[in-house]
């Protein structure tokens, strides 16, 4: 049985982005990680109270990550960007074989989804992960949900 981790990159733990993740994972057993609940400092900053290792420990035990972000100024949230930057501190081989789904939520994410899809596919390629797809609409969510249920 696959272990699925929903990574919510919104400032709200139960807002529209969280709902997108919940719809994508409807009927599937998963854990939720809200990036807003952790102190994650910028790449290059070193503080004793940084909690990125706690995030990493949850990610290590998951087989599939469902990452959802709101669109702010035609791009991913700052939390997701910091998460991506910090991921570069870890060996790519740590994530070998894991799977990733991207959820993008916003009023009009169409101009954002292409560059974000490219970025996440590149991230998956570098880390030897499998990119399962992205969702911005209910129809797309239903298709990804069906695929995730096969993993569960």
Regions found by a protein language model. Name each.
Residues 96-135:
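Short, glycine-/small-residue-rich phosphate/pyrophosphate-handling segment
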Residues 93:
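Serine-hydrolase catalytic core
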Residues 1-90, 121, 125-127, 132-152:
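N-terminal beta1-alpha1-beta2 submodule of the flavodoxin-like/Rossmannoid cofactor-binding fold
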């Amino acid at each position: 049985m696959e272990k699925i981790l929903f990574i919510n990159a919104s400032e709200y733990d139960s807002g529209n982005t969280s709902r997108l993740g919940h719809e994508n994972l409807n009927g599937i057993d998963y854990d939720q990680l809200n990036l807003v609940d952790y102190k994650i400092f910028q790449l290059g900053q070193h503080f004793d109270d940084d909690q990125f290792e706690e995030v990493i420990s949850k990610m290590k035990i998951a087989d599939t990550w469902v990452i959802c972000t709101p669109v702010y100024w035609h791009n991913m949230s700052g939390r997701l960007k910091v998460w991506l930057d910090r991921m570069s501190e870890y060996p790519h081989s740590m994530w070998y074989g894991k799977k990733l789904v991207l959820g993008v939520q916003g009023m009009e994410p169409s101009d954002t989804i292409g560059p974000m899809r490219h970025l996440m596919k590149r991230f998956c390629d570098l880390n030897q992960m499998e990119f399962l797809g992205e969702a911005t609409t209910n129809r797309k969510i239903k298709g990804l949900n069906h695929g995730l249920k096969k993993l569960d």
